[in-house]
């Protein structure tokens, strides 16, 4: 796929490696200065706090994957091939999901490697519980990134301009995330139907309280499916049914 051959992909991987190195180094110095002990699982538990960087990369890639073809005037060359438009759209969608997965995989493999390098391999009973909770959080974060990617693909197909698609994606997605917190603050039950109220499945762990009363894991799965279908259908229609003008 062309996306994996773009310089931005290589640059992103290099930046992630550099970022993980300095993050591990800083946390190691903090641990030493505090006179405490830490292991690689403890370090790994810190890394999801910067999930916003991976989400941002996913949004940018998804929001430009179609619109970039219009910006570069290559969309007609893509569509004159003996392949139906819908197959091109599905290939773009699969690429977004795969790239998001590979970004997370690369990020956390690097986190694991630097965690082992700086903090060693010792594991305690508490560490195992922490690892399970961390993996659950990583899974929820990736699911949220995929949903953001689907919306970015919708914007990319709708606006057909990279700058507009990226800006709208960021404004709407992070605005919606803020709206969830506001509705939670005012205890508005309609907030439970918003996308970002349902992407964090760690809220259903034992001892945790759901964002809104009445929410269950099945409810959240249903809301996510509805949003995903809506994003995909609208994106598909914009890409497959509208006339191509460049």
UniProtKB/Swiss-Prot annotation:
Keywords: Cell membrane, Membrane, Transmembrane, Transmembrane helix. GO terms for cellular component: plasma membrane. Pfam families: ABC2_membrane_4. This is Uncharacterized membrane protein YdbK. It is a multi-pass membrane protein. It comes from the Bacteria. The keyword Lyase does not apply. The chain crosses the membrane at residues 7-27, 50-70, 99-119, 135-155, 163-183, 219-239. It is found in: Cell membrane.
């Amino acid at each position: 796929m062309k996306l994996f051959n773009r310089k931005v992909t290589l640059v992103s991987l290099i930046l992630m490696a550099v970022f993980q190195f300095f993050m591990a180094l800083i946390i190691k110095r903090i641990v030493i200065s505090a006179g405490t002990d830490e292991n690689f699982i403890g370090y790994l538990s810190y890394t999801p706090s910067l999930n916003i960087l991976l989400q941002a990369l996913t949004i940018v890639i998804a929001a430009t994957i179609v619109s970039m073809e219009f910006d570069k005037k290559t969309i007609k060359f893509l569509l004159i091939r003996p392949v139906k438009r819908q197959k091109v759209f599905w290939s773009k969608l699969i690429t977004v999901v795969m790239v998001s997965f590979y970004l997370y995989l690369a990020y956390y493999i690097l986190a694991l490697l630097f965690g082992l390098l700086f903090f060693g391999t010792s594991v305690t009973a508490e560490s195992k519980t922490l690892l399970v909770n961390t993996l659950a959080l990583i899974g929820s974060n990736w699911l949220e990134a995929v949903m953001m990617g689907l919306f970015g693909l919708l914007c990319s197909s709708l606006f057909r301009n990279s700058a507009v698609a990226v800006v709208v994606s960021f404004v709407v997605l992070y605005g919606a995330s803020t709206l969830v917190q506001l509705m939670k603050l005012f205890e508005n039950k309609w907030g439970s139907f918003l996308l970002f109220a349902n992407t964090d499945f760690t809220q259903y762990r034992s001892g945790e309280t759901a964002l809104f009363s009445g929410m269950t894991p099945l409810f959240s799965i249903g809301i996510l499916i509805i949003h995903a279908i809506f994003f995909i259908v609208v994106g598909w229609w914009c890409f497959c049914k509208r006339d191509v003008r460049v």
